[in-house]
């Protein structure tokens, strides 16, 4: 029986790199991994309005570097770098090391309509605000294709429209070859809170194939004539299956 796997994990070491870059001895590995999870949660909480796409962590025994990809770099930096200082203090508190040197690098996401995390979050926020789950998916797909992605697939799961039975509905346009390992496919999951429970939002975005180590991201506009809709009724709540 076939099993589903995250496209991000499946491509690690092939066309995708790890989001944590460091080496630790056996007794220190678990400690650092636990800290990284808490650091991401803490930073995302501090920057909840900054449209953060991804946080990459690089570290040694005495230094830690946070590479934050965001669509709103001004919010991340803050007035006179105030937010950067707050982030550094929060990281030192989590690591329980006041002497830890913390460096924050900010990379601007220039095309948020083609970013998997920001697209999933936008769809989820619109659903939380009682927008039509079908309309927001179609709009997100149109904007992503206009941004130049090769293909995009969206899926929402839960008590859609407040009905009693949970189900899954989604759309796909363009090419999204999940089994092609050289395909540069991004995947994101967002859980949208509503008055009738959690709605799971999944987004897959194909940026093209990675050939010779070179990504073809947002190079050509995906075709508009490949529009397929799927509808899977099930009893699962939320986006996890």
UniProtKB/Swiss-Prot annotation:
Record carries keyword Ribonucleoprotein: yes
Record's keyword terms, sorted: Ribonucleoprotein, Ribosomal protein, RNA-binding, rRNA-binding
A molecular function (GO) term: mRNA binding
GO CC terms, sorted: cytosolic small ribosomal subunit
Taxonomic superkingdom: Bacteria
Region Disordered, residue ranges: 215-241
Pfam family membership, one: KH_2
KH type-2 domain sequence ranges: 39-108
Signal sequence segment: none
Biased composition (Low complexity): 232-241
UniProt keyword annotation of Oxidoreductase present: no
GO terms for biological process, alphabetical: translation
NCBIfam families xref list: rpsC_bact
Subunit structure: Part of the 30S ribosomal subunit. Forms a tight complex with proteins S10 and S14.
The protein's role, per its UniProt record: Binds the lower part of the 30S subunit head. Binds mRNA in the 70S ribosome, positioning it for translation.
Family assignment from sequence similarity: Belongs to the universal ribosomal protein uS3 family.
Name of the protein in question: Small ribosomal subunit protein uS3
Organism for this UniProt entry: Mesoplasma florum (Acholeplasma florum)
């Amino acid at each position: 029986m076939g099993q589903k796997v995250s496209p991000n994990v499946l491509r690690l070491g092939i066309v995708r790199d790890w989001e944590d870059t460091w080496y630790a001895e056996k007794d220190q590995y678990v400690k650092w991994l636990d800290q990284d999870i808490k650091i991401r949660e803490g930073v995302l909480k501090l920057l909840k309005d900054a449209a953060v796409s991804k946080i990459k962590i690089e570290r040694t025994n005495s230094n830690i570097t946070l590479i934050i990809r965001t669509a709103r770099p001004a919010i991340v930096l803050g007035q006179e770098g105030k937010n950067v200082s707050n982030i550094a203090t929060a990281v030192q508190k989590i690591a329980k090391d006041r002497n830890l040197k913390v460096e924050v690098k900010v990379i601007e996401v220039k095309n948020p309509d083609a970013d998997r995390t920001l697209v999933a979050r936008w769809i989820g926020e619109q659903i939380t605000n009682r927008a039509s789950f079908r309309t927001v998916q179609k709009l997100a797909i149109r904007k992503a294709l206009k941004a130049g992605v090769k293909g995009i697939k969206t899926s929402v799961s839960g008590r859609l429209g407040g009905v009693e039975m949970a189900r899954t509905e989604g759309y796909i346009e363009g090419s999204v070859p999940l089994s092609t390992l050289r395909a540069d496919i991004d995947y994101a999951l967002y859980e949208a809170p509503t008055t009738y429970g959690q709605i799971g939002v999944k987004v897959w975005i194909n940026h093209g194939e990675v050939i010779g180590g070179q990504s073809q991201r947002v190079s050509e506009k995906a075709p508009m004539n490949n529009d397929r809709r799927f509808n899977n009724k099930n009893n699962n709540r939320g986006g996890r299956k």
